[in-house]
Amino acid sequence: SFAKTLDEIDADRIGVWGISYSGGHAICVAGLDTRVKFALSVVPVVDGFPTMRRCHGERKFAAIQKLILDDREARQRGEPSQMIAMATTDPDNEISSWPFPHVCTIFQDIKEREAPNHIHENTLESVELLMQYDVMPYAKRLYETPYMMAIAKGDNITSSDLEIDVFNAVPCPNKKLAIVEGVDHMSLYSNNEHLEKVSSAQATWLRDLLFGPDALLAQAAE
């Protein structure tokens, strides 16, 4: 609704594009709002419960579930939700939302280089909400909304098999899946060459969608 009020926005060609958690949100927004004319996701979070279960493993997952239940009771007593690290360099001994050391080091590097206000922690309530997150019902609503998903081959953070299941559930025939080799979930945040592999594939699809497949040839001829 806000985007349509902006002079620089073509209200007939509004789309959504997101990476990781916001990649899942792009599916949800497109499924909820028919004014969205296309959607693109990069390594999206698609189903929080199995994602967390896989990431933490059975024993760690049981421990974080216990923390979540304790946190519910604390919030009922009027206490704030407990803060935990988003990721740590020692996930075997320290609880975190995403138990991968390289997630911590990459985001700390981003904080030092370009995002000084980044705080590398979140509430347990946020983890609880993540475990309730499932984009599948919204993916099934994309009957006429063109959609593209780009995933990292073998992604062990957001689980490429879960992502492919969601892609296959999108009923719109105008959809494309790009499985990109030689990149991983976090390298898209830290390696511009890896990001370029994904963004170029999506940019090509988007250009063809909005301007037609001959757009590049016409541009080269000018």
Q: Where are these predicted regions, by residue range?
A:
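Gly/Ser-rich "nucleophile elbow"/oxyanion-hole loop immediately N-terminal to the catalytic nucleophile
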Residues: 1-15, 78-79, 83
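Gly/Ala-rich beta-loop-alpha elbow adjacent to hydrolase catalytic centers
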Residues: 18-22, 26
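Alpha/beta-hydrolase-fold enzymes
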Residues: 25-107
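Active-site nucleophile elbow and catalytic-triad environment of alpha/beta-hydrolase enzymes
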Residues: 55, 121-139
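Conserved alpha/beta-hydrolase "acid-adjacent" motif
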Residues: 131, 156-162
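Short beta-strand/loop motif that positions the catalytic acidic residue
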Residues: 142-143, 149-151, 155
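Catalytic histidine neighborhood in serine/cysteine hydrolases
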Residues: 170-186
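Catalytic histidine-centered segment of alpha/beta-hydrolase-like enzymes
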Residues: 183-196
